[in-house]
């Protein structure tokens, strides 16, 4: 577990503070990895060429870390992998549709959306239409993903 900060393992107050900020759903395992470490893991998964197999495992809720559901960090890394892979927009949006049900707190949502640099390089009108469908959803995090994507990538004079 070289990516887990020692302080998270040894300092109960720090660990509880970290968990309280994340506000995960009950039963979600938190390893304590920081975002730079998760980005490194995501980039390694993409670079390995095995990213599709890993996404399939995550879709089936098969964690990297053994038994049980996906950890908070695995959900974060899943989103980062989607952001880092070089695929056509239609394929990326399909991956996003399978990822969004795994989004269960603000940190996963906002981390994914703010690291979605591909939005700036793709057909912004097509992505906007997709975002509109997300925002109109009654699902809390599906709607939030749409809102945060729009705030992160469409809040400019050109789009207002």
Question: Residue locations for each model-derived region?
Answer:
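Alpha-helical scaffold domains
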Residues: 1-160
């Amino acid at each position: 577990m070289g990516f887990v900060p020692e302080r998270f393992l040894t300092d109960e107050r720090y660990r509880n503070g970290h968990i309280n900020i994340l506000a995960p759903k009950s039963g979600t395992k938190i390893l304590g990895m920081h975002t730079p470490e998760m980005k490194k893991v995501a980039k390694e998964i993409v670079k390995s060429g095995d990213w599709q197999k890993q996404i399939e495992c995550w879709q089936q809720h098969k964690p990297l870390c053994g038994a049980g559901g996906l950890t908070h960090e695995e959900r974060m890394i899943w989103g980062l992998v989607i952001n880092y892979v070089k695929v056509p927009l239609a394929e990326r949006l399909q991956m996003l549709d399978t990822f969004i049900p795994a989004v269960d707190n603000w940190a996963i949502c906002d981390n994914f959306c703010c690291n979605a640099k591909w939005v700036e390089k793709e057909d912004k009108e097509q992505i906007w239409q997709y975002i509109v469908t997300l925002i109109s959803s009654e699902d809390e995090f599906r709607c939030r993903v749409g809102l945060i994507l729009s705030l992160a990538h469409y809040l400019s004079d050109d789009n207002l």
